[in-house]
Amino acid sequence: MTKYVYSKDQSYQKFNVDDELNIRRKKLSKLREKGVAFPNNFRRNSISNQLHKKYAHTSNVELIQLNIEVTIAGRIISQRIMGKASFITIRDAEGCIQLYITSNSLATNLYDENIKQWDLGDILGARGILFRTRTGELSIYCKEIRLLTKSLRPLPDKFHGLNNQETKYRQRYLDLIINENTRKTFKIRSLVISEIRQFMKKNNFMEVETPMMHTIAGGAIAHPFITHHNKLGIDMYLRIAPELYLKKLVIGGFERIFEINRSFRNEGISSYHNPEFTMMEIYMAYADYRDIIILVQNLLRSVTQKILGSNIINYGDYELDFKHPFTQISIKEAILYYLPETRSQNIDDICTAVSIAKSLGIKVKSCWTLHRIHMVIFEEVIEKKIIQPTCVTSYPIEISPLARRNDNNPEFADRFELFIAGREIGNGFSELNDPEDQKERFLKQAYGKKNKINNNNVHIHYDEDYLIALEYGLPPTAGIGIGIDRLIMLLTDSHTIRDVILFPTLRPK
């Protein structure tokens, strides 16, 4: 097996990986013989980025006068060996810094011995004095340097290595070592989730945790993953949504709650779907879906400003505006707006709606209602046209089993979905708190629709325990589920969900 790696003089050469492994293993064997392989008694007092920031405006003359000694550690990413002096660049979690090593600063025999043993990818610990090179680069004149971890496998170089996307996902650790943009993406992800938590705390929401294993696959319409509890002797389901447990907590008196956690759906994999994904759900008592829209607007405005420094962000060719209130539009209004040719037609006539759908290449089923036809036209044709943050309302009650009916038009739910850059980011609604209405809808879901799981017909979405809880009284409540991974895609200008999940689901090799 061959691959491209950097040589010590920074040229790039073709190596046989097995040969390189053998060479590095021999070096490790020598370290073991000396009893210095993989030491764990080195401590650092500095991080590269902190040093660069703190001494950004300090001249070399001032640094020499200050005589600042630091200890630092990181992975070798480049080496320049010039006889009795060498420059080595190491990278830690925050950035890079250059080490300057000479046979004068270390004993000559120690210098020669160390340089021969080090390879790209090795992890070093160093102690030395800060100075600037002739080119002005902040560096460390090393008094002591130690090999902390020997890397047995050569790193791919930045030009030829990890061009295969699947390799990046399968060996994410290599992607993180080599690709600065990947590291930046996941740092932003962490900051975004942290800022979301801070925002929710400031708005008096309590973070909670609900079960990951359910005895009933409820809370959403999706295929679950099935597992088995040996002691209880029952099948259980990895949760497809935490919704019903969270609403039980609202019934119990927690009026403002949220959860950020994983959900699992045994369905397709695509650029916007991963079977294991991170979702945030928010529930607020004494509120309706319009209050949730305002909350989410403020949340995203805060996150974009604090993490990215602006409410206007770039995503691909689009400039997304989180500064102004989100557009609100019904499904019917969206059809008329994005398909101007339909404005002269009566789309409330089912025959006309069928004709429009067929003209768009949609195969219409005879059992579909008018609202279902509108919904499919929207999903198949309109969604991808919505670029700016937009709350789409007036969803049919028939596809909204947990949402409250609209008072003025009971055929529709008090529900909205948030679309940005052509994709659904969130789904929110005023919660159904009428236990008898909820029971009727559960029955329709459970006995009107069956899923085949493990070759058995399994009735879905009938949760008697939730109905009992609902009979104790759920206050007027609204909630939303937000796809965190999709949100991170927007905020990092990523175009596949795999780029924002550290270890996405892959088929085994």
From Swiss-Prot:
Main localization (coarse): cytoplasm
GO cellular component annotations of the record: cytosol
Pfam families assigned to the protein according to its UniProt record, in alphabetical order: tRNA-synt_2, tRNA_anti-codon
SUPFAM superfamilies: Class II aaRS and biotin synthetases, Nucleic acid-binding proteins
GO-annotated molecular function: ATP binding; lysine-tRNA ligase activity; magnesium ion binding; tRNA binding
Annotated Mg(2+) 1 binding sites: 417, 424
Protein EC: 6.1.1.6
Subcellular location: Cytoplasm
Cofactor note: Binds 3 Mg(2+) ions per subunit.
Keyword Transcription attributed: no
Cofactor(s) this protein cannot do without: Mg(2+)
Membrane-traversing stretches: none
Superkingdom: Bacteria
Name this protein carries in UniProt: Lysine--tRNA ligase
Organism of origin: Blochmanniella pennsylvanica (strain BPEN)
Source taxonomy: Bacteria, Pseudomonadati, Pseudomonadota, Gammaproteobacteria, Enterobacterales
Gene designation per UniProt: lysS
